[in-house]
Amino acid sequence: MYKRQGLLGLNAFAVKVEIEASKGLPSFDIVGLADASVKESRERVRSALRSSEITLPLRKIIINLAPADVRKTGSVYDLAVAVALLRMADLVDDSMLSTSAFIGELSLSGEVRPVQGVLPMTIMAQKMGLSEIYVPADNVREASVVEGIKAYGVRSLRELVFHFEKKAAIVPAAHYKPTAESYFGSLDFADVKGQSAAKKALEVAAAGGHNVLMIGSPGSGKSMLAKRMPSILPAMTFEESIETTNIHSVAGLLDSNSPLITTRPFRSPHHTVSPAGLSGGGSVPKPGEISLAHNGLLFLDELAEFSRPALEILRQPLEDRQVTISRVSGSITYPCSFMLIAAMNPCPCGYFGHPTRKCICSPKQVSSYLSKVSGPLLDRFDIHLEVAPVEFADLSSTAKEESSASIRERVQKARDIQNERFKGTSITCNARITSDILHEVCPVTDEASKLLENVFDRLGLSARAYDRILKVARTVADMDGAKVIDKKHIAMAVQYRSLDRKYWNG
């Protein structure tokens, strides 16, 4: 039996390749709930063996991929099947295989081609107690991220045979360790002139992991601000890097030269993206944009231009921090814990409420445009931010703006407070506070409580909006170094919830 791993979403599972050769008409069959791509492996493996000058005995050969009740898809089983046949031909000794796993697709000429999902499969092999894993050479740096298991990069089936025959050993890859800290990108908040209020709101959002909706006329700097958000977020932890890399590996988007992602993802899909493009999908479900943004940011520019089904599909993942894709063959769940940053114009022409330019839209057009963003989705934005046009004095000023590094220091201090507060729990920041501990971790003064009560009654806020105001106020208090939420902290949090009343219920 020769081991390799399969994939269901991000979850790797062990597959044992069993082989039997018996008397009878020469044949070669693969069983074990294999799909068409796996059954085609017979011809790839046959041709690869022939090209490598390896002859199979004239026998009836049956390959079983166990467990037989789990569907096997893809071409990742080729190398393990070939190794099983090599063992049957006495070209490999059992002692060399008992603690090894094999992953890779074979070409007709015997080359070993790269496959997707090597990192989660290597992690599973290490957890199983295996000491060696053989992967395509193009994937070996990805496998070398995992400690406690030797990763061998194989270029061809012939090279693997020489390795087993000890004619030309394959050297295991050195364990990959990122030599530099997380890269925060070349974009900097110092490039943005003016917009001090918007910068402060985004700093609060970064400090607490809050979702942000920006509304403003064209050219006010919404996209420019959003693209600089990763530069003020805290550096990724190693665990976050592994989670993020796993997702990109399964999606086939991992750069072979950068096997471990250390930069927070920034995904910005076009407004024509389909619901499946956002959530993930396909006959073999792959991660969508919301999962690719895991541990990072999802930026939706021109929010009102997205289709209603695409926007509504965000609602549940924003609450659950995971998305489940169901197919006839089963369900797959991907994580999607991300910050949502959205930007939109206030009307079709973009100039409703502009201080100098006249809006040419009718009230009905404005109302119809804004109604594309539903109330339930609007409720899931913690911070509503109006981005005003930049003043000429700010544009022409030669004064230096505050850098992202300086802002990031304050954000990190607030996150350190939160890390201490939520130590030993699955909560990572204030935006993730669950309702059962909300009042415990968000104590308020009597004055703050009265203000919150007045605001709740006067504005007719939903229970979700109330919770989000309290969470934002908790972040503002953390940035202020306060243990108890005061009136001024509530006032700032309420200020960040005013635009839904101005534009949607005005």
Please place each PLM-identified region on the residue numbering.
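Walker B catalytic acidic pair
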Residues: N295, D301-E302, I313
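Basic, amphipathic alpha-helical bundle interface domains used for macromolecular binding and assembly
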Residues: V31-R42, P57, N64-G74, V284-P285, ...
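Peripheral, non-AAA+ core regions of ATP-driven protein-machinery
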Residues: K3-L213, S220-S223, I261, S326, ...
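Walker A/P-loop
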Residues: M214-D255
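Short beta-strand elements
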Residues: V15-A21, L278, D382-L385
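Conserved alpha-helical scaffold flanking the Walker A/P-loop in AAA+ ATPase domains
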Residues: E203, L260, P265, P275-L298, ...
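Catalytic P-loop NTPase motifs of RecA-like helicase/translocase cores
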Residues: S109, L300-S307, G350
